[in-house]
Amino acid sequence: MSTVLTALHEALDSAPEQDMTTRLDQSWLLGFDTETTGTSPNRDNIVSASLVLRNPRTGYEGDAVAEWIINPGRHISEGASRVNGFTDEYLAENGSEPAESIEQIAGLIMTAQSKHIPLLAYNAPFDVRMLNGDIRQWCSGGMEPMPEKELLVVDPLVIDRAISHRSGRRTLTYTTEYYGVVPHGDFHDATTDTVASVDLIEPMTTLYPQVGSITLGELMDWQRDAHRTWLKQFNEWLTSKGSRPAIDTWF
């Protein structure tokens, strides 16, 4: 086991088991992001992933971080390669064996879940479903996919749509700029994206105290309601343009 992976294990083991009355602005968080061969769970694969454990008392300086480079043994699409910079040749030379890496990532996430430490990801369904697709492909003998409907998740994209009524795009790049979050590196690097996503919670909960006061026990219902409200408005707009309504894909 690598030194950084050991450090994350130790930090997670020493983290407290949180009560469900813990407020979001006082909660430990486990940030998660992936880079992939494409955008289709069950067809594409993860090539890079990062987990970042954030202690609310120490912030960025106290983060425990682990990153994986994974060789799925398949072609990465040109579009994905342009976005994340990975090539087939680089992954073949530097990537780890998929099953072990995917088991490590999922195991750490479920350890955090057992302590009521939310999994934080920007547009969380994508990363969770990519991971579950890889669990099904690589770990069918020893690990079940994560129970998506039972996960405790923080999705800054869902929160932002509920509290900020600005116009324009809501990619991670634009959203961090809006909230004054400066990335620690280049976007579309899994660790940079993970840290930036976690960093969003402080300005969001400071600017909107009603978000900071959401308890872990209230968190999923609040986000589901917020997503349904946004989706209804978005589909009304799509319909007015003659487009087909979007399907609900949140947890």
Residue ranges of predicted features:
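Short, surface-exposed acidic-centric catalytic microdomains
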Residues: 64-84
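A generic alpha-helix surface/boundary motif
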Residues: 74-75, 85, 129, 170
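DEDD superfamily 3′-5′ metal-dependent exonuclease/proofreading module
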Residues: 1-47, 54-64, 92-251
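Short, structured active-site "lid" loops
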Residues: 83-94
